[in-house]
Amino acid sequence: NDRFEKMHHGGRHNHCFSSPIYREKVAIINQKLAERYGHHPALLMWHISNEYSGDCHCAYCQENFRHWLQVKYGTLAALNAAWWGPFWSHTITDWSQIDAPSAIGESMVHGQNLDWKRFVTDQTIDFFEAETKPLKAVTPDVPVTTNFMADTVDLLPFYSLDYGKFAKHVDLISWDCYPAWHNDAMSTADLASKVGFINDQYRSLKQQPFLIMESTPSGVNWHDYNKTKRPGMHTLSSLQFLAHGSDSNLYFQRRKSRGSSEKFHGAVVDHDNSADNRVFQEVAHVGELLEKVQAVKGSDKVARVGMIYDWDNNWALDDAQGFQTQD
């Protein structure tokens, strides 16, 4: 973590993208997957990993960060000029003096904080490419994707990774959309506007239709209040996905888990294992509708308004001490 403490195993994403052993084992697994399933007639695409996120502050990552900076700046003089290091006596005189921003170390050098976020994106993409390489070697014509995310109940673009850069490395965009319908914080119309906006943004990442890789047919388990969709809401929200450029409406999860942290997350098949409840019936209805609207698959959408969203700029403004911002 950012206190340079080695964490115990647990939670999610408890791996290091820099670990040579982890990379080696992932390559072996993916090679075997490609060899076994690569020419199966049911294979449509490869889904790589799951919801990339997080950073690591281990010795491997620190060294990779220093190397990344050396490649970017070339000299310490250039780095100090970019980071304005002499202010507060932060001049770097050796590459080994540089660590990632830390809760127990440096955290006030604006350029360093910004470069760390850029590095995290680049390192994540590099790991994605390492995962993809054995698959592409065996199945060069099978597309690859990974599931992007949104941030928080407000459905803001995911903050921690530059999806604009990441999008160049996937064959198609897919993402996990979990709006908290019927919440007390905003109207259904306001939330629908947020859903529409972020769908438009993710469609624009590659200027082509995308996939909804995860959605819930009922409620989620991680909002403050997790309400089941009202009758008809699942159909309405599913059609909104299509109207904004999605070619799918996939679900997490198909069957509710018997235990652990997401046992109450919505699913197509509930704990009662029944096809008679309203949620299952509405999922079936959406499936029938998708069959009827096959003609819209792959449709282009012409945008009449252009907007710029820049992850670099967002990070920079958020980290600029004293910059006047409004919540």
Positions of predicted regions on the chain:
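Carbohydrate-binding surfaces of carbohydrate-active enzymes
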Residues: 98, 171, 175-327
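Polysaccharide-binding and catalytic clefts of secreted carbohydrate-active enzymes
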Residues: 2-172, 176-188, 192-197
